């Protein structure tokens, strides 16, 4: 039986604490669209996305109005294009990206993900063509997002792919020089990428997924912060164990909301419901910040000593509460630390509290730590590859998802600001300890073997 206080607290979440469903993402398999004729492939892709996702925005809006819970982003994730369009050349891959962008605009969605490849153990010709197409594809489209998986606990780290992605990021930044390298904001490099991520830029539909499926990403950092603030105001002597329990209970409510909306949308569209991703996703709006949660837990700012421990507490409590609320939890399900997309985190970086090394340390206990990190425009491809390799190693050794979304901002140096607009926000450019110290190591290439604990059979 719900108490009056619980009902009122849920209403307060909706009214004043920015509770919403951050994204409803429809996965669409493109494998039945495959063929050797690029024009026919593009036609098949457009027709299938229209058929399955044509009413996605309308249905999400209707369900949101019915329950008073806004769905902020409506998105589509498709099969990895490097697989579905494996016989195509680089220019043909670019044309596929443009068709995806056109289709996304026609149906009114925010982003379309899946322009990516899975290369943790090596490349096919389709993989090489797609990765070569990424800079032009992202620079010439608005809604297309790309993700490339270069490592896994079972395969190790493909260092040739890591180096190639360092070069790709540089090229993508240069092609969008006038917009602070914004193409890189739509490109994510992964280790252990899940097949059901609803969040961009990592979303794609895995090969083991249904023909179509709804996956939901919840929100709620503002809700968690307010819950902690209320509890500490009522009882200043609460310890971290008690605060963890409060976060857990709040996460339960947030996840219940996400699953309710997701299932209603799936039923209305006539497709299966997949998972709820439990990641707390911030925005650049006041009161919707993951960074502010750390201050509510007693830290002066995110980035000071104790930050990684606080993040571990937060991540664990959110997972425990969310897992109890939903039978199907998936995606990344770990706190995001997107530097430019969170006002508080961006401010901490500009004040010097957040270094590259601290962000990397935080990644060991969350899913995406080097996220929307702006770097100096002269950062070399080898240095980018070294940063990516470090991030991949954390994921591979700890059997978890990690990712890097790095933005070398052309023409700007550490300490200057980069602005990406909208949900992508703005951030100070973070310094890197050395720009050329990784060159020899990265140029060796090859594959770093999988760790011994990958042998689990």
Swiss-Prot record:
HAMAP family, A to Z: UPF0210
Native source species: Syntrophobacter fumaroxidans (strain DSM 10017 / MPOB)
Quaternary assembly: Homodimer.
Domain of life from the UniProt record: Bacteria
Similarity section: Belongs to the UPF0210 family.
Lineage of producing organism: Bacteria, Pseudomonadati, Thermodesulfobacteriota, Syntrophobacteria, Syntrophobacterales
Listed name of the protein: UPF0210 protein Sfum_2948
Entry-linked NCBIfam families: PRK05313.1
Record-linked Pfam families: DUF711 (PF05167)
CDD domains in the record: RNR_PFL_like_DUF711
């Amino acid at each position: 039986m719900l108490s009056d206080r619980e009902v009122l607290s849920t209403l307060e979440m909706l009214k004043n604490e920015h509770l919403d469903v951050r994204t409803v993402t429809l996965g669409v398999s493109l494998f039945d669209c495959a063929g050797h004729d690029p024009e026919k492939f593009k036609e098949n892709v457009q027709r299938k996305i229209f058929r399955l996702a044509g009413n996605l925005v309308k249905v999400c809006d209707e369900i949101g109005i019915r329950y008073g819970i806004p769905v902020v982003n409506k998105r589509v994730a498709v099969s990895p294009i490097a697989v579905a369009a494996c016989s195509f050349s680089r220019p043909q891959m670019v044309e596929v990206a443009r068709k995806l962008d056109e289709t996304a605009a026609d149906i009114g969605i925010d982003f379309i993900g899946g322009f990516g490849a899975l290369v943790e153990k090596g490349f096919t010709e389709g993989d090489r063509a797609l990765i070569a197409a990424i800079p032009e594809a992202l620079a010439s489209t608005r809604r297309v997002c790309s993700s490339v998986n270069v490592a896994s606990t079972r395969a190790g780290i493909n260092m040739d792919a890591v180096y190639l992605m360092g070069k790709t990021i540089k090229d993508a930044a240069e092609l969008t020089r006038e917009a602070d390298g914004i193409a890189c904001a739509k490109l994510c490099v992964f280790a252990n990428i899940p097949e059901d991520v609803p969040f961009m830029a990592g979303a794609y539909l895995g090969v083991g997924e249904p023909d179509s499926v709804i996956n939901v990403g919840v929100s709620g950092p503002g809700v968690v912060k307010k819950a902690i603030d209320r509890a500490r105001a009522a009882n200043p002597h609460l310890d971290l164990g008690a605060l963890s329990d409060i976060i857990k209970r709040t996460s339960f409510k947030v996840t219940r909301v996400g699953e309710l909306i997701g299932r209603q949308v799936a039923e209305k569209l006539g497709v299966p419901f997949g998972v709820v991703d439990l990641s707390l996703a911030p925005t650049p709006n006041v009161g919707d910040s993951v960074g502010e949660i750390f201050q509510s837990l007693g830290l002066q700012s995110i980035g000071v000593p104790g930050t990684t421990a606080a993040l571990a507490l937060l991540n664990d409590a959110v997972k425990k509460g969310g897992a109890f609320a939903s039978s199907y939890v998936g995606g990344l399900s770990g706190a995001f630390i997107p530097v430019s997309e969170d006002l508080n985190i961006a401010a901490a970086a500009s004040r010097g509290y957040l270094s590259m090394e601290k962000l990397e340390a935080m990644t060991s206990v969350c899913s995406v730590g080097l996220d929307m990190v702006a770097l100096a425009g002269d950062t070399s491809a080898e240095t980018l590859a070294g940063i990516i390799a470090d991030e991949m190693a954390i994921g591979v050794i700890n059997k978890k998802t990690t990712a890097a979304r790095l933005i070398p901002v052309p023409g700007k140096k550490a300490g200057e600001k980069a602005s990406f607009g909208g949900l992508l926000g703005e951030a100070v450019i973070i310094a890197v300890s050395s720009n050329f110290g990784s060159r020899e190591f990265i140029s060796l290439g090859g594959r770093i073997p999988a760790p011994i604990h990958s042998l689990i059979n």
